[in-house]
């Protein structure tokens, strides 16, 4: 597992004498959320206090340029289960979640956002589902509506990416990149090194679990309008989501991506070869040779990539 570099290592105060490990760790990334971060902390702590679960709330300030960190430090003495971690420079949502999960002391890790969009009062419900069903390794809050920015562009693009992910994993995925989820920390540890620094980290953890036959359960949730300014950039982040879906499936099952392409090229090349021979026997045009050669090369790459994956998993 990769370790964080010195420049991205978080800073936090020592907790004093060792305390019993909680059952749940909630990782809350915070970046320029001064208007509502304390309200979010209050809402999460109130919900968890009302449950029968021991917990810690890990609020990670990702080098905010406003008063987010100062407000968290002020709130820390008021909430006994709150731990505040600060980054020296902005590492991204994926870096926050990765390091937060690595530093978590709970058996169950919860990811959510601090922008008031997710119903964090339902976190105990997600935890209870995991606790009651040992066969389930992750519970995801599946949003029933899209309330984010660039809605006209985001909805069709996310639908296409989600359908591609479903096709490549042979699994129905109601919400590919929901930010509210609970999972077993021990199961997630081998996949944390795969998390990218940006928003596509949630897509990555979903595909990592599905590609390795870890059962994911989806719970319908409401999704509120975001408080404050969105950090989502449509073109850049949509491209990263699509690239990450392909990268993750290539990492775990490259035959799913490469072999269909190889078969298409070989099929078209073969049909073109037959057509060429009927039209002019013993003549093979350059484009026919290119199609057949490309198909063979891609097929060889697919088999080699699959061999590498099997060798890696067996090591």
Where are these regions (language model features)?
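Short beta-strand/loop segment that forms part of the nucleotide-sugar
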Residues: 53-63, 85-86
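Hydrophobic targeting segments
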Residues: 22-28, 37, 44, 55-60
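Acceptor/aglycone-binding surface of glycosyltransferases and processive sugar-polymer synthases
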Residues: 85-103, 108, 120-199, 203, ...
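A conserved acidic beta->alpha catalytic loop
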Residues: 61-70, 116
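Hydrophobic helical membrane-anchoring modules
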Residues: 2-23, 200-315
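Short, well-formed alpha-helical segments that are part of the catalytic scaffolds
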Residues: 10-12, 33-48
């Amino acid at each position: 597992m990769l370790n964080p570099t010195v420049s991205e290592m978080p800073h936090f105060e020592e907790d004093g004498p060792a305390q019993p490990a909680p059952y749940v760790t909630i990782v809350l990334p915070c970046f320029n959320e001064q208007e509502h971060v304390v309200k979010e902390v209050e809402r999460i702590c109130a919900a968890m206090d009302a449950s029968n679960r021991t917990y810690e709330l890990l609020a990670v300030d990702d080098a905010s340029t406003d008063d987010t960190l100062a407000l968290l430090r002020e709130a820390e003495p008021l909430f006994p289960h709150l731990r505040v971690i600060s980054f020296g420079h902005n590492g991204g949502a994926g870096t926050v979640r990765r390091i937060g999960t690595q530093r978590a002391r709970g058996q169950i890790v919860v990811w959510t956002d601090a922008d008031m969009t997710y119903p964090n009062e339902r976190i105990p419900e997600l935890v209870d589902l995991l606790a009651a069903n040992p066969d389930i390794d992750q519970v995801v809050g599946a949003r029933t509506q899209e309330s984010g920015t660039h809605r006209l562009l985001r909805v069709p693009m996310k639908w296409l990416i989600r359908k591609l992910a479903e096709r490549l994993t042979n699994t129905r995925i109601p919400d590919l990149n929901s930010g509210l989820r609970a999972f077993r920390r021990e199961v997630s540890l081998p996949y944390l090194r795969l998390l990218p620094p940006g928003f596509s980290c949630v897509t990555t953890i979903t595909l990592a679990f599905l590609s390795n036959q870890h059962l994911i359960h989806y719970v319908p949730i409401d999704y509120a309008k975001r408080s404050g300014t969105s950090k989502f950039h449509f073109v850049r982040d949509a491209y990263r989501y699509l690239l990450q879906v392909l990268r993750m499936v290539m990492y775990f099952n490259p035959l799913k991506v490469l072999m269909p392409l190889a078969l298409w090229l070989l099929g078209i090349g073969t049909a073109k070869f037959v057509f060429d021979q009927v039209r002019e026997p013993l003549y093979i045009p350059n484009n026919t040779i290119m199609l057949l050669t490309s198909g063979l090369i891609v097929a060889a790459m697919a088999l080699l990539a699959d061999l590498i994956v099997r060798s890696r998993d067996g090591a």
